[in-house]
Design a protein with these regions (language model features):
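Catalytic loop of short-chain dehydrogenase/reductase
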Residues: 128-156, 161-166
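Catalytic Tyr-X3-Lys loop
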Residues: 97-116, 157
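The beta1-alpha1 cofactor-binding region of Rossmann-like NAD(H)/NADP(H)-dependent oxidoreductases
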Residues: 38, 53-67
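Conserved glycine-rich cofactor-binding loop
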Residues: 12-13
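Conserved mid-core segment of classical short-chain dehydrogenase/reductases
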Residues: 87-105, 146
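C-terminal helical subdomain
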Residues: 170, 174-175, 186-227
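Amphipathic alpha-helical dimer-interface segment in Rossmann-like NAD(P)H-dependent oxidoreductases
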Residues: 67-71, 108-130, 166, 205
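Conserved glycine-rich Rossmann-like NAD(P)H-binding loop of the short-chain dehydrogenase/reductase
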Residues: 26-42
Length: 227
């Protein structure tokens, strides 16, 4: 991946950080963002990737992120991983009827509009053979009690993926790594983010466009293709 430029939003923790590390280790030019400047600087120092403090709720931040990535690479971006997301509250303890308007609005602005913004701002720089990957999970498709706005936002983000997959030339897909131990899921007994990061590398490099465009790439799909 020495000649490829990869952008990862939400790259300072969890899956995002693991994906930044995986692509940097593969030789790609990786540009990532996060809200916390200190965390961005820490990940950049550890991985050798290029960190930008940016908030996906702000389209001007995202525009600057994509311009930085194009400038640092070969003028184009070959891969975008639209990973940034929030989950306000404790999973399983967020009855939707009790969700504050402010929490609903911020979750949707980050997890749905943030995906939209990331793809829109990437498009002027996205290579003709570029790809967009968006992490999601079964919570977007299978209702579970007390998951609050997070579940709704994930369903919304998948709808955004399907719309772009239909409308643009480059493939856009959902990557569902199953339950992963992150701050968003609130569990620490699931898969480690580092164990699922190779899914993203496979979807970016080995999977065919027909295999991924508008599709959900889950663990079964990945393991079947790589065993």
């Amino acid at each position: 991946m020495d000649d490829r430029t990869v952008v990862v939003t939400g790259g300072t923790r969890g899956i995002g950080r693991a994906v930044v590390t995986a692509f940097a280790d593969a030789g790609a030019t990786v540009v990532f963002c996060g809200r916390d400047r200190a965390a961005v600087e820490d990940v950049a120092e550890i991985t050798g990737a290029i960190g930008v403090r940016a908030d996906v709720r702000d389209e001007f931040d995202v525009e600057r992120l994509m311009e930085t990535a194009a400038r640092e690479g070969d003028g184009e971006i070959e891969l975008v991983v639209a990973n940034a997301a929030v989950n306000h509250g404790t999973p399983g303890k967020m009855p939707i009827a009790e969700e504050p308007y402010s929490r609903f609005d911020d979750t949707m602005r980050t997890n749905v509009r943030g995906i939209f913004t990331t793809i829109v701002e990437a498009l002027p720089h996205l290579a003709s053979d570029g790809r967009v990957l968006v992490p999601s999970g079964s919570i977007a498709r299978e209702a579970k009690p007390n998951m609050g706005t997070y579940a709704i936002s994930k369903a919304g983000s998948e709808a955004v993926v399907r719309a772009f997959a239909t409308d643009i030339e480059q493939p856009v897909c959902i990557v569902d790594p199953g339950l992963v131990a992150t701050e968003l899921t609130g569990v620490d007994t699931a898969r480690d983010p580092e164990d699922v990061a190779p899914m993203f590398v496979w979807a970016a490099t080995e999977a065919t466009e027909d295999e991924i465009n508008g599709e959900i790439v889950d663990l079964r799909t990945w393991k079947k293709a790589t065993r």
